[in-house]
Amino acid sequence: MSAITESAVRSALSRVEDPEIGKPLTELGMVKSINVNGPDVDVELYLTIAGCPMKSTITGNAKAAVEELEGVGAVNISTDVMSDEQRRELRMSLRGGVEEPTIPFADPDSTTRVYAVASGKGGVGKSSMTVNLAVSLAARGFKVGVLDADIYGHSVPGLLDSEQRPTAVDDMIMPPIAHGVKLISIGHFVDGNAPVVWRGPMLHRAIQQFLADVFWGDLDFLFMDLPPGTGDVAISVAQLVPSAELLIVTTPQNAAAEVAERAGSITQQTRQRVAGVIENMAAMVLPDGSTLDVFGAGGGQQVADRLSVLTGAEVPLLGQIPLDPQLRVHGDDGSPIAVSEPDSPAGSAIGEIADKIVRRRESIAGRPLGLGVTRP
């Protein structure tokens, strides 16, 4: 039986990641000390802040990793808190040595696919589609984030059952994680159901901070849940993340489709790309296998066809999500149907759209788009 060494313990800890940052504890300077006394091991770790919500997860994972070493005896994990200087160094390291926060997704070399999920009107399931696509892609092994840009009507934390508040490392915000998805919302910063009463400049600043001050890490996909319509936030997103592509959500009825066209036609001014249209609340599948078009039919294809003409580029209908009460039930429970019932008609349809988005990313990942909007 080989003796336990400090090097072996450190190697074991290098396989443990900080769940918020997604990097090894050893790389983040979070291992304060390792003491080996025969087969017994004492490890002291640095936490980024006092009261770190991930403390039990970090210490538990560290203990489990060390206990896998052959011949190890008792393993004790204790914690300390980083100093202000250590937090500043960590922040600088995570930002690549850049002092001031920048928006990583605005970098032309960014390989993160950014989708702004939009609708012409409220109540069409835009937020539900956002979170379901996000968790579906996370379940496929991708690194995914959701930015709730619907400041007035924020709903993402509830749809993902996220009650954990973000933590801060110096002036960098660590987003909560739910269902494998990093998320940030103004709902994390207001008490209860308090309203947010802001004018346009404040909305712009909030979106800018969520993009720049939050540590998103190396995401494959970022979904931005926009408010309905074509107001200040839609313009801010076009200015701040020129490469963001639009996903338009509508329902089958003509009235909703006509309004959805307006949401997509903003790209004529911003020179963004419409990645596709999602038709929600399509035909309901009845117990006998027949279908019922509760809200009519054809709205999604109508929007896709019309936007193809307006933009001069093919805008596909990515999919039709059947009207399914369980989609609402799982949304209320914070357990999106895409992962709680992936084989259901709605869950399967969402999964197919997620697969199309993956294929699109693999074919044109990282290609920058132009922007014709004047920065404020």
Residue ranges and their predicted role:
Residues 137-200, 204-212:
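Phosphate-binding loop that captures ATP/GTP phosphates
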Residues 333-344:
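C-terminal boundary of histidine-terminating zinc-finger modules
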Residues 41-49, 115-117, 245-246:
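Short, hydrophobic beta-strand segments
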Residues 113-151, 264, 277:
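Walker A/P-loop phosphate-binding motif and the immediately C-terminal alpha-helix
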Residues 1-32:
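N-proximal, solvent-exposed amphipathic alpha-helical segments enriched in charged/polar residues
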Residues 90, 205, 213-216, 220-329:
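Conserved catalytic-core segment of NTP-binding enzymes
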Residues 27-30, 48, 56-118, 361, ...:
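Extreme N-terminal, non-catalytic leader segments
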Residues 20-46, 321:
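Short edge beta-strands and adjacent turn/loop segments
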